[in-house]
Amino acid sequence: MAKQALQVAIDGPASAGKSTVAKLVAKRFGYIYVDTGAMYRAVTYWAMQQHVDLADEAAVITAMKSLKISFKPGEPDQLVFANQEDITAAIRQPDVTNNVSTIAALPQVRTILTEQQREMANAGGIVMDGRDIGTTVLPNAEVKIFLVASAAERAKRRYAENVKKGIDTPLAQLQAEIELRDHKDSTRKVSPLTQATDATLVDTTPMSIDEVVAAIAKIITKKQSSTI
């Protein structure tokens, strides 16, 4: 009998479309979606609210002790909570976006969140996206996808998202921020952004969201039929 409840890991750089695609893939297969990036953003937001030095790992860890991150169903997107506070919109603001790489580079923070993410994935039937899901968080995931797109294309996508949210940031600035974040994510000492050796590379630059979802769904369906 084919195994149905797979672990699906989707990795890639900032604004490659991971979250959007992961949500749609999860919905198609009736899987649970875990936004690991939102968890790092939640820690970043929480630490900033506590006026913590984001480079001070001990202080960030202390702040995390009073933080419980949770996800709840929402329409169209799931909601993210810090304790009882809805921070769904707050964690997507530029100040959080531009500081999350600092938090993500802290080894103990990654260890704590990685354990939480693994617990969520234990039962299978889960889609998780981030920077190091296939390499570190879920190294044994049955399906691993690495999404990429050009920095210019990713900047255009981020710009369009920001316009809808009423955020006015010049396109050139967004591309510069994305390129800087790529550098930070790929050169950090702990769990740098890298493609797992057994991951399937999908370049989304010329593709629509529906085309990307269809391509990944095909990979999952094939794996479901071959995993006993």
Curated annotation (Swiss-Prot):
NCBIfam families assigned to the protein according to its UniProt record, in alphabetical order: cmk
Binding site for ATP: 12-20
Keywords, in A-Z order: ATP-binding, Cytoplasm, Kinase, Nucleotide-binding, Transferase
Name of this protein: Cytidylate kinase
GO biological process, any: nucleobase-containing small molecule interconversion
Compartmental location: Cytoplasm
Family stated for the protein in its record: Belongs to the cytidylate kinase family. Type 1 subfamily.
Enzyme Commission number(s): 2.7.4.25
Gene Ontology MF: a single term: CMP kinase activity
Pfam families: Cytidylate_kin
